[in-house]
Regions:
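Class I (Rossmann-like) S-adenosyl-L-methionine-dependent methyltransferase catalytic domain
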Residues: 1-104, 120-200
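A conserved beta-strand element that flanks and buttresses the S-adenosyl-L-methionine
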Residues: 112
Length: 200
């Protein structure tokens, strides 16, 4: 039976102090790190952000607090999130595997995909990564828990895959790891120095 990403789901895992796995302060720090790394490698301010599997668009506020003029687009499969936040937070309907077919006017400076990929089946993940690499012109924040970790929170549908499995797929798509769940786009990876990139 598929999960229903309705309001009660987000209440349980993102707002309930007894169950949520990350605080707002932690999210602000992640956003600041992702923006800073993207701007370092781009050599300019972040202008565009794509948030894949954005849910209620929790990343939007901390990013806009840093860069008020940023253009933010969220994609999520939750009908509730799209209905409630579509206009106010620019959240549109979309699933990870659909990224292979999506194209926009230009690539995004920062792509966020947090707490999503460890629920995505392998065939869909492989298809989506190809599209994600094409949509990312700067840096991607791909937060994933692996078999080697001890994840908390929603474990229903969690796929216990080894870190090496993800590293191989990210690398095959053209991403280069640069630490702390951050990956350089294929374009930036080609311009980076050896020690800026994590070993494959």
């Amino acid at each position: 039976m598929p999960k229903d990403y309705d309001r009660s789901y987000f209440d349980r895992w993102y707002r309930d102090p007894a169950r949520r796995v990350a605080s707002r302060a932690a999210l602000r720090r992640k956003a600041a790190m992702a923006v800073a790394v993207a701007e370092h490698f781009l050599g300019r301010r972040v202008r565009t952000v794509l948030d894949v599997g954005c849910g209620e668009a929790a990343w939007r506020a901390p990013i806009r607090a840093l860069r008020p003029d940023v253009s933010y687009l969220g994609l999520d499969s939750s009908a509730y999130a799209v209905r409630r936040f579509g206009r106010s937070r620019n959240v549109r309907a979309g699933s990870f595997h659909e990224l292979a077919a999506l194209r926009f006017e230009r690539p995004f400076d920062l792509v966020v995909c947090a707490d999503v990929l460890h629920y995505v089946p392998a065939p869909e993940l492989s298809r989506g990564l190809t599209g994600l690499a094409a949509l990312c012109g700067g840096v991607a924040y791909l937060e994933v828990m692996t078999r080697e970790d001890d994840p908390e929170g929603d474990l229903r549908g969690f796929l216990k895959r080894p870190a090496a499995w993800y590293r191989h797929r990210f690398s095959t798509a053209g991403f280069a790891a640069c630490g702390s769940h951050l990956y350089l786009s294929p374009t930036l990876a080609a311009r980076s120095t050896t020690l800026e990139r994590a070993p494959r």
